[in-house]
């Protein structure tokens, strides 16, 4: 709201403002005129008053999206992951306990600094645990570091894709296979043909838009970079997939494809834990939502029956 007030103040002073965003609600709220681009090309320029959100989406994607979220048809099974009294040594994470089931998409909501990201990083062994217990399929796992966590069946798609997700100087094949190189070892050598074949399979199955697998990942769009990172983790065959802001900075068409990938993983019996700042996204994709506040778990709600107001109230509980 403060940003919007500043933008409106600058506009009233005669400043011209170019505002770039994937969030259509913001665009329609503050813009006088909207320009839509797709694949580096100009598509349309119209007065904001003449546009609806659905019309913007259609122009952005090049086709009509009847639903913003895929229909949930995943089957939820028994408890797979049990987290008890988890606290961080150097983070604000404080006595967090929850359960996640096979085939479940578990959302994590909260304000910035609430402990959402810290929770995923703690489970994955990036940060030091002060106390608590993590049990996977009835067996305690220590997850003292990412290497150990990967061996135990965990994968983490990080919040800052460009800083901690991709290897920008490497190509798509190298980014896809880098966490699973042992699969391609033949003595001291790597089986390049097998690596190429695997990468081609994922490019096709995840519909990665790229000239070829030799393309540097840094030249891809955000959505396609995210698909490559997902392919990397799928190669490790994780049981629990931790996703931190998986659709941040991604256009609405690519978002739908990411949502479908998440749902497909849940349908295969994987447990998906997903942090998002977009409450509509959590409500549309997840089965259940944990709400973090001040490093503590302030509530757990059913995505079918809750609403944004209830989530925001819980998010402010320990602020």
Question: What positions do the PLM features span?
Answer:
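Glycine-rich phosphate-binding loops of nucleotide-dependent enzymes
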Residues: 1-319
């Amino acid at each position: 709201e403060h940003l919007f007030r500043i933008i409106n103040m600058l506009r009233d002073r005669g400043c011209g403002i170019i505002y770039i965003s994937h969030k259509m609600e913001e665009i329609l709220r503050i813009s006088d005129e909207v320009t839509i681009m797709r694949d580096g090309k100009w598509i349309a320029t119209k007065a904001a008053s003449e546009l609806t959100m659905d019309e913007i989406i259609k122009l952005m994607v090049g086709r009509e999206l009847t639903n913003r979220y895929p229909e949930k048809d995943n089957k939820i099974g028994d408890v797979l992951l049990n987290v008890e009294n988890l606290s961080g040594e150097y983070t604000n994470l404080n006595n967090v306990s929850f359960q996640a089931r096979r085939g479940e998409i578990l959302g994590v909501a909260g304000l910035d600094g609430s402990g959402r990201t810290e929770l995923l990083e703690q489970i994955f062994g990036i940060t030091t645990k002060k106390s608590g217990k993590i049990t996977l399929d009835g067996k305690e796992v220590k997850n003292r570091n990412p290497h150990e966590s990967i061996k135990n069946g965990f994968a983490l798609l990080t919040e800052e894709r460009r800083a901690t997700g991709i290897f920008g100087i490497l190509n798509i094949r190298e980014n896809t296979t880098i966490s699973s190189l042992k699969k391609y070892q033949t003595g001291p050598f790597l089986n390049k043909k097998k690596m190429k074949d695997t990468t081609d399979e994922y490019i096709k199955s995840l519909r990665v838009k790229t000239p070829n697998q030799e393309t540097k990942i840094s030249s891809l769009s955000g959505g396609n970079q995210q698909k490559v990172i997902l392919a990397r983790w799928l190669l490790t065959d994780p049981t629990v997939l931790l996703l931190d802001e998986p659709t941040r900075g991604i256009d609405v068409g690519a978002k739908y494809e990411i949502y479908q990938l998440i749902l497909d993983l849940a349908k295969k019996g994987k447990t998906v834990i997903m942090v998002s700042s977009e409450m509509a996204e959590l409500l549309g994709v997840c089965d259940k939502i944990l709400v973090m506040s001040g490093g503590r778990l302030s509530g757990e709600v059913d995505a079918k029956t809750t609403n944004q107001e209830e989530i925001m109230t819980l998010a402010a509980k320990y602020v």
